[in-house]
Regions:
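N-terminal hydrophobic/helix-forming segments and targeting peptides
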Residues: 1-358
Length: 358
């Protein structure tokens, strides 16, 4: 899907941590408007394209999230080094010597490098321990606090990982920052594009929430606004096909199809919806990897308990090296997740909704 690769590139290239999703939302609005009957926005920044049902009264929410993990500027020292606090879940060991982008108030992007005390200056005991985030700083190549401020740096500036979108040796393997969760953003656009000239029998809301990485916050707001009868959170899942993890689980392998999450730390998939999706996948010969994730969660955690309760499941793709500066997905998994969710939409109507409820 060349068009999908271009879509993924444009969405991962743009920067937007939790609470600073404005650029991503603006781009999503450009993509959603031509393929939607209506644009629905909440006051926190969530955005969805709506496609009206030709027949039928029920509604389905397909929800990615706009935000990516990153950092916020908390201090500038006298030498112009910048200190920061994480936004979203980070592991200290993946941060050192990585390039980042600091976005100033006027939108200027300044490149920097996360640094700390060099290895030559570490004691034997220090070398055995991960570097604490409080001992890391960002070097933007200035010599003083005044010079950093003149460049536009101030407290509260957004900091995002810097990583270019590229294909690897096998061009089905793509690497970029922010596949978590610009994958879900791209999928929402592609599903609406697939259905643009079709009649459907369920009101479809496809788009993305805000502030997922800091506690599934925007999903609660969006679900309360849309009030869907069913929901699918679209997000990435852990890939277990790398050294050190392969023996743990026989799931989450790149190239083996989308992931359907049976349970995680914040939600349990609605069983009637699970069975319906399983039937759809088998009927259309779409590969699915059924997975459990004891830790972590997705927007499903907030959506399924909104209003009077919303039958919800998470569908995504396995992703290597998530919550770091760079990650890897397989475009076939993306394509099959678009196929799967498009067929789910086509399969739903008032009768099939009643059949999956219990």
């Amino acid at each position: 899907m060349p068009e999908s690769k271009a879509l993924l590139k444009s969405l991962t290239d743009v920067n937007g941590i939790s609470g600073h999703e404005m650029q991503v939302k603006s781009l999503m609005k450009d993509y959603l408007t031509p393929v939607s009957d209506e644009i629905v926005e909440d006051r926190l920044g969530g955005i969805f394209g709506k496609k009206n049902a030709t027949h039928g009264t029920k509604s389905l929410m397909i929800s990615g999230h706009l935000d990516e993990i990153g950092f916020i500027v908390t201090q500038i020292d006298e030498q112009g080094y910048i200190y920061f606090t994480p936004i979203g879940g980070w592991w200290n060991q993946v941060m050192l010597s990585q390039k980042v982008t600091i976005t100033t108030e006027n939108g200027k992007e300044i490149r920097g490098i996360i640094g700390s005390k060099p290895t030559h200056a570490l004691s034997p005991e220090e070398r055995k321990k991960p570097v604490d985030i409080k001992n890391m700083y960002i070097d933007i190549g200035v010599g003083s606090k005044e010079e950093a401020k003149e460049a536009g740096i101030e407290l509260g500036n957004m900091i995002t990982p810097y990583s270019e979108f590229e294909s690897l040796a096998n061009d089905k393997y793509l690497t970029a920052k922010a596949f978590d969760n610009r994958y879900g953003c791209a999928l929402a656009v592609d599903v609406l594009q697939q259905l643009k000239d079709e009649n459907i029998d369920i009101n479809l809301y496809a788009g993305a929430t805000v502030q997922e990485e800091v506690g599934l916050r925007g999903a609660k707001v969006a679900a309360n606004l849309i009030k869907p009868d069913l929901a699918i959170a679209v997000d990435v899942g852990v890939a277990y096909d790398v050294p050190g993890m392969t023996s743990e689980k026989n799931e989450g392998k790149l190239g083996d199809g989308p992931l359907a999450i049976l349970m995680d730390a914040t939600s349990i998939a609605h069983d009637g919806l699970r069975k319906h999706i399983k039937d759809v996948a088998e009927h259309h010969n779409i590969p699915v990897q059924w997975a459990t994730t004891p830790g972590g969660g997705t927007d499903a955690g907030s959506i399924h308990v909104a209003n009077e309760g919303i039958p919800t499941i998470t569908i995504g793709v396995p992703l290597r090296y998530m919550h770091s500066n760079v990650s890897v997905l397989n475009i076939d998994d993306y394509t099959n997740s678009v196929r799967l969710i498009t067929e789910i939409v086509r399969s739903l109507n008032d009768d099939s909704y009643q059949a999956l409820m219990w």
